[in-house]
Amino acid sequence: MIGREQQGKNVIVRATLLLFIIMGFFSMMAYLHTYNTPAQLLHLPIVINTWTFINATRVAYRTMQSGGVTERIALDGIEKGCNWCEAHPDHCDFTVGYGGSPNEWGQTTLDAMVMWGPTREVGAVGYMKRVKPAISVARKVMERTYHTILVGDEATTFAVEMGFEEEDLNTTRTAEMWREWKAAGRKPNFWKGPHNSTQGVTKRKEMNEKPEFGRWNHDTIGMVAIDQQGNVACGVSSNGATWKIPGRVGDAPIVGSGAYCENEVGGAAETGDGDVMMRFSPSNRVVQMMKGGMHPKEACERMVAEILRYYPNCSGAIIAVNKQGQIGAAYMNLPNGFPFCLQNSNMKDAAIITIKD
Ligand SMILES: *[C@@H]1O[C@H](CO)[C@@H](O)[C@H](O)[C@H]1NC(C)=O
Ligand SMILES: *[C@@H]1O[C@H](CO)[C@@H](O)[C@H](O)[C@H]1NC(C)=O
Ligand SMILES: *[C@@H]1O[C@H](CO)[C@@H](O)[C@H](O)[C@H]1NC(C)=O
Ligand SMILES: *[C@@H]1O[C@H](CO)[C@@H](O)[C@H](O)[C@H]1NC(C)=O
């Protein structure tokens, strides 16, 4: 005989089981919703990129909308979009492409990366000289070699072998900047103490205690795109930090830092003080957080909060988009907030979105 108490317990057990089944059903639905949302809900294609470089957004969007150049449509969007900044550095704060961010020797060098979400293929160039469309060379590294990153003069050699033109990246603008910087005692710089270099001796009293990172010194175009087929690509192009020590490679060509994307989840890209930010693999981390179901905005905010715990003065920003077409961004130590660009098929034109505290 089953006592009243026992029956009561059975009811509770059954109710609990039922509850678990219902909860399981809903969490499975939520899971399926996260990973299999139909394309028509997403307003694809979609592209986001850092800063106000809205023509790059438009070019990326139009490239995808018109069906791309190759079958990797989102990647074509990334390449053509970033190419726009590389060809028009004056419209991209001189932080991408030629004619900007000279190093201690007055040279402009380029960093770039692309990633294809369906296969996780990556190609990148670092500290590349004398070739303008760096992101296109990065794509060649990905598609024509088994390597991931080529750097320096040999990246240039590779680019020339691939048919790219060799050109000066310095201009009268960078030459003038460099002269002024030398005349002002080579401040700021990235050394931690007095040092001798080929440029001469720098004494303690001539040093900037902290290098100045900010809007104009240190940024990048970082871009994430999802094409009509739901494929995700991401990429970055940058001319690095102004007055960098020759040889310095920034975060832009470092996969997981400059950008990262997974077809099942979405993608993220970053901009800012790359020397510090690359220590956290922020773009990869944001994508992994989104994979766990986190909204892109919250993922970016958590990542920025973590960096600030270790480097309270680090300046920069992260943008992200998930497979549902939800976007998010977060920034740190940018006094005027952080602008980024968005275009999707629900919008007549690209828009600049500025986040501020
Ligand atoms: C975008 O490109 C057009 C020319 O195609 C140019 O007139 C305009 O100034 C550019 N806008 C920005 C914000 O760079
Ligand atoms: C760029 O720098 C190189 C090496 O210093 C120099 O030969 C060249 O004339 C410069 N080009 C421009 C446009 O200033
Ligand atoms: C730099 O070189 C000078 C001699 O030219 C030497 O006295 C000094 O110790 C050197 N400083 C450093 C930091 O190496
Ligand atoms: C951050 O900047 C403040 C103000 O310039 C300075 O006092 C502080 O030492 C800096 N902190 C670090 C960790 O660099």
Predicted features and spans:
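Alpha/propeptide regions of enzymes that mature by internal proteolysis
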Residues: I12-D357
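Short, low-complexity, Lys/Arg-enriched N-terminal segments of secretory-pathway carbohydrate enzymes
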Residues: M1-N10
